[in-house]
Regions:
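Short, surface-exposed polybasic-aromatic patches that bind anionic ligands, especially phosphate groups
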Residues: 1
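C-terminal non-catalytic regions of proteins with extracellular/luminal or membrane-system context
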Residues: 5-219
């Protein structure tokens, strides 16, 4: 038996086509459709689309905070992958009808020792979504995060919301396949998303109460 990989020849094991195909399938099955107003998704290949949000320009945010031996350079850039499928994609919202907005948290803000008492989206992201909507754009939000986030400040302005988590090596390909309709976003949330940070902490083993000092335990 030879249970260990020859460290001198990693290319014989890592990033093989068959492994990347499995990674893409797992990533596609992890994406959750949270909103799809007027069936805006899937997007047509000829749609006039633009791209916004710094989160989507970093391969590190696609990998997540536990990539182990995975390298950000192993990921295809999301913007370039989008351009391959959507021929009229622009980085200027002035030339588009639909804006794909990347919102959420950077990958280094999740994981051990990264607790937050406020899980609202950053104010600059909220301002970006509202400003684009004020220009009459349809908003397709890609939510990149490793924890539940409060979406109450942006949800009314979004026409579609896709929870895309941290999908690993084949993140860009899986996201584009979902946006284009090649893949069906069949994932389910594994946790509750509060409307606002004021709802946390959320307990599952007791009834909520407005009065302090007593707890609403189940009998």
């Amino acid at each position: 038996e030879h249970p260990y990989t020859d460290e001198k020849n990693p290319e014989e094991v890592f990033l093989l086509p068959r492994n990347k195909e499995v990674a893409k399938q797992l990533a596609e099955e992890s994406i959750v459709l949270l909103k799809n107003r007027d069936a805006i998704l899937p997007l047509s290949a000829d749609a006039r689309i633009s791209f916004a949000g710094e989160l989507g320009k970093s391969n590190g945010n696609l990998c997540g905070n536990w990539p182990c031996c995975g390298l950000p350079s192993d990921n295809a850039p999301l913007l370039e992958t989008l351009k391959q499928s959507f021929h009229h994609l622009s980085e200027s919202s002035a030339d588009s009808d639909i804006v794909i907005c990347c919102i959420g948290q950077e990958s280094d803000k999740t994981g051990e020792n990264h607790s937050f008492s406020n899980i609202d989206l950053p104010s600059d992201q909220v301002a970006m979504v509202r400003e684009l909507k004020s220009r009459g754009k349809k908003i397709v939000a890609l939510l990149m995060n490793g924890r539940p986030l409060a979406l109450g400040e942006v949800e009314p302005y979004c026409d579609a919301i896709l929870e895309v988590w941290r999908l690993g090596t084949m993140a860009s390909e899986a996201i584009v396949a979902t946006l284009s309709g090649e893949s069906n976003p069949s994932g389910k949330l594994a946790m509750t998303f509060p409307y606002s940070s004021g709802q946390i902490p959320v307990y599952y083993n007791r009834r909520p109460r407005s009065r302090q000092g007593t707890q609403g335990f189940y009998e």
